[in-house]
């Protein structure tokens, strides 16, 4: 009985490791790299609150520039 439990844990561990190694982790990294150029990201961008409104709000808050990055308004210093 103990051998079966150990085998099950080993198989589960290998499945988790294989799944993790085969997943595309660069998909998660890409937005972080692009937003790293911006200092502050806050409200989501929508059809009513777009790039122009975001840039205006950022400049109003005394940031150098701003725009929608991956669906969020991000301001640059």
From Swiss-Prot:
Keywords of the record: Antimicrobial, Disulfide bond, Fungicide, Plant defense, Secreted, Signal
Signal peptide: 1-25
Residues in coiled coil: none
Tagged with keyword Protein transport: no
Species of provenance: Arabidopsis thaliana
Listed name of the protein: Putative defensin-like protein 60
GO biological process terms held by the UniProt record: defense response to fungus; killing of cells of another organism
Main location class: secreted
Bridged cysteine pairs (disulfide): 41-75, 45-68, 54-73, 58-74
């Amino acid at each position: 009985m103990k051998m079966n439990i150990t085998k099950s844990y080993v198989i589960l561990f290998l499945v988790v490791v294989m799944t993790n190694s085969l997943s595309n982790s660069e998909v998660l990294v890409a937005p972080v790299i692009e937003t790293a150029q911006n200092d502050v990201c806050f409200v989501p961008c929508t059809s009513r609150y777009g790039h122009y409104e975001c840039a205006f709000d950022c400049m109003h808050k005394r940031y150098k520039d701003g725009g929608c990055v991956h669906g969020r308004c991000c301001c640059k210093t």
